[in-house]
Amino acid sequence: MKFAVIGHPIKHSLSPLMHHANFNALQTDDEYAALHIDPKHFHHLRDIIHEKAIDGFNITIPYKVDMLQVVDVVDIKAQMIGAINTVHIEDGIWYGYNTDGAGFKASIEKYTGGKNIVILGAGGASRAICYTLFKDNKVTVLNRNTNRVADWPFQIDAYTYEESDGVIQQADIVINTTPVGMEGFMPDTLIDISQLKSSAVVCDIIYTPDKTPILQSAAQRGLSVINGLDMFVNQGALSYEIWTGKKANKAAMKQAVINYLQRSTLC
C-alpha cells in the first residue's frame, strides 16, 4: 500500500522515517512519502492523490482545517476537533479522522482521570487534546485571549495568562500546546513553574528540542516531565491502524525517531 504526508512546507517531516521503520519491523512492502502541496495547487489535491495511487495520508500544517471541506465523510471526533490529520481512501471515498488528541492521551494515560489539567494555548492541537480529555478530567485553557475557545463546540473554561495564578496552583497536569520553546522561537515557560505543586506533571507536545524551557524548569523543580515524542509516535501508529486495520510497531517507530534526533544533535 502507498501512504504519504502532505503539507507546506514538508521537507522537515519525520513521518516518512517513522513509518518506514514500522514497515521494516512488520516486514511489509508499504511505502510512505512526503508530498509538498503548494497552496495554489491544494484545490487539485484529489487529482494529485489519485494520480499517485495513494491509499491513505496524513495532513500537517497548513491543511488540517481545509481538509474538512475535501473529504467525503468526517469522523465525529474530527468534526468536534475541527481538523483532520488522517485520510483513509476506500473505494474512492475519502474518510477524514483526527488522531492527534488520542495520540496525546495515550502518551499520558497513566496520569489522567479526574485530574485538573491546564492546557497552554488555544490552537488546533489544544482543541484536539481538550476534546479528548475534558470528559474525564477538569480541563482549563490558558491563552493570550479566550475568544477562540468560546467558538469551540464543547465547553471549556478559559483564562488569560494574567488570570492564571489560582488555576496553576491547582493543576495536576500542565500541557504546552504552543510553539513557544520550539527551536527558532523565543525561550519562555509561559507560566510560573514555582506555583505548581510538587506532584504536578508537565508536558509539551514539542519533541525537538527534547526538553523545552518549560520542561527544563519543571525538571529542575523535580517534577515529572513528558515531551511530545510519544504523541507523535502514537498519532502515527493510530493512522496506520486506520489505513490497514493492523497494529503498528510503536517501539520501532519511536526508536527510529530517537536515533535520528540523536544523530542530528551530534552534527
Swiss-Prot record:
One of its GO terms (molecular function) is shikimate 3-dehydrogenase (NADP+) activity. It holds the Pfam family Shikimate_dh_N. It catalyses: shikimate + NADP(+) = 3-dehydroshikimate + NADPH + H(+). Disulfide bonds: none annotated. Its EC number is 1.1.1.25. Gene3D superfamilies: Leucine Dehydrogenase, chain A, domain 1, NAD(P)-binding Rossmann-like Domain. Shikimate binds at S13, L14, S15, T60, N85, D100, Y207. The active site is at K64. Pathway: Metabolic intermediate biosynthesis; chorismate biosynthesis; chorismate from D-erythrose 4-phosphate and phosphoenolpyruvate: step 4/7. Signal peptide: none annotated. GO terms for cellular component: cytosol. It is an enzyme of class 1 (oxidoreductase). NADP(+) binds at G121, A122, G123, G124, A125, I205, G228. Keywords: Amino-acid biosynthesis, Aromatic amino acid biosynthesis, NADP, Oxidoreductase. GO terms for biological process: amino acid biosynthetic process; aromatic amino acid family biosynthetic process; chorismate biosynthetic process; shikimate metabolic process. HAMAP family: Shikimate_DH_AroE. Belongs to the shikimate dehydrogenase family. Homodimer. Involved in the biosynthesis of the chorismate, which leads to the biosynthesis of aromatic amino acids. Catalyzes the reversible NADPH linked reduction of 3-dehydroshikimate (DHSA) to yield shikimate (SA). This is Shikimate dehydrogenase (NADP(+)). It comes from Macrococcus caseolyticus (strain JCSC5402) (Macrococcoides caseolyticum). The lineage of its organism: Bacteria, Bacillati, Bacillota, Bacilli, Bacillales. The gene is aroE.
